[in-house]
């Protein structure tokens, strides 16, 4: 069950990021820290 909760959380996070950020380009890196997640392209 923990796995499914983690997967659902990741899906929700990616959905929120997709709404807040432009479409990620190839080579995009998802940076995750204790308090923030953000996308860095490069």
From Swiss-Prot:
Q: Which GO terms describe its cellular component?
A: extracellular region; extracellular space
Propeptide part(s) removed at maturation, as residue ranges? 21-26
Q: Which residues cross the membrane?
A: none
Keywords assigned: Amidation, Immunity, Innate immunity, Secreted, Signal
Instruction: Enumerate the Gene Ontology biological process terms.
Output: antifungal humoral response; defense response; humoral immune response; innate immune response; response to bacterium
- The source's superkingdom equals Eukaryota
Give expression by tissue: Hemolymph (at protein level).
Summarize the record's disruption phenotype note: Adult males infected with spores from F.oxysporum or F.verticillioides display reduced survival.
The protein's location, in the record's own words, is: Secreted
Q: What switches on its expression?
A: By bacterial infection (at protein level). Induced by Gram-positive bacteria M.luteus (at protein level). However, another study found the peptide was present in both immune challenged and unchallenged controls (at protein level).
Q: Which residues carry this modification: Threonine amide?
A: 41
The leader peptide range reads 1-20
Function summary: Peptide which plays a role in the humoral immune response to a subset of filamentous fungi, including F.oxysporum and F.verticillioides.
Q: What else is known?
A: 'Daisho' is the Japanese term for a matched pair of samurai swords, one short and one long, and refers to the role of the two Daisho peptides (Dso1 and Dso2) in defense against fungal infection.
Query: What name goes with this protein?
Result: Daisho1
Q: Which organism is it from?
A: Drosophila melanogaster
